[in-house]
Each structure stands twice: as C-alpha cells, then as structure tokens.
C-alpha cells in the first residue's frame, strides 16, 4: 500500500498540505503510484493567486495527464524546480524532494486528516 504521512493533511484530489508557514503543497504517494512514471510537471508561477479546489497545474505520466488542484487559497511564494527538472522525483519522493510549491495561505480548502485520507484511498498511515 501507498504511504500516507500522519503529519500532513490531504485534499480529496490527492494533494497534501504541510501547514507550516508558508504552506508547502505536493501530491500524495497514492496519486503518484496511480499515475505511474511521471514525465512532465506544470506548476503555477511565483506570485500566482490560487483558489482552493481550482486547477493550478498538471502532472503528465506515461499513462495519463492529471490536473493539480490547489488545496488552499493564497499566493504562490516559491516553486520547487526539482520536479520540473526531474519529474520522476514525484514517484521517488513525493513527500520530500518532490514537493511542488509553497503558498502564503489566506484560506484553507476542505482538508482530510491522514487517517481520513488513507481510509478513503487505501493507504497506510506512517
């Protein structure tokens, strides 16, 4: 089973949120495993205004293209270049070096605890 980190919160669309300030966002290992080999990542630019639940980028794999939905409302303050340069990092380390961007949050969207997310999606909480 895919790993779900207990220290993070999750959106129903498979993004994770680390609530430190600024808030770090990524995709879950469950999402990365379902996508297969990731070959391309498109993310919002620094300064972009995001709305919780709205698309803000996409991840392309050898199997499909999936949108990235912002789990929070706010302004992008940093984009991680690593997944752009090496998209496979989303498969290898989605909770570490594979984080996507950080946001100065003005409002959170509906988020699930690790236990709720794992229960709904078949992951193991660690």
Regions found by a protein language model. Name each.
Residues 60-69, 86-89:
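Short, Lys/Arg- and Gly-enriched loop/turn segments at beta-strand edges
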Residues 71, 85, 112:
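Charged, alpha-helix-enriched surfaces in structured cytosolic catalytic cores
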Residues 17, 62, 79-82:
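Residue-level recognition of beta-strand microenvironments
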Residues 1-55, 88, 92-126:
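Acidic, low-complexity mobile loops and tails
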């Amino acid at each position: 089973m895919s790993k779900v980190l207990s220290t993070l919160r999750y959106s129903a669309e498979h993004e994770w949120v680390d609530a430190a300030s600024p808030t770090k966002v990524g995709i879950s290992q469950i999402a990365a495993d379902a996508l297969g080999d990731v070959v391309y990542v498109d993310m919002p630019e620094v300064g972009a205004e995001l709305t919780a639940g709205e698309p803000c980028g996409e991840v392309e794999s050898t199997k499909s293209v999936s949108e990235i939905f912002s789990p929070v409302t706010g302004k992008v303050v940093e984009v991680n270049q690593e997944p752009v340069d090496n998209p496979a990092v989303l498969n290898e380390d989605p909770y570490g070096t594979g984080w996507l961007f950080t946001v100065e949050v003005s409002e959170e969207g509906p988020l699930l605890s690790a236990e709720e997310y794992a229960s709904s999606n078949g992951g193991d909480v660690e």
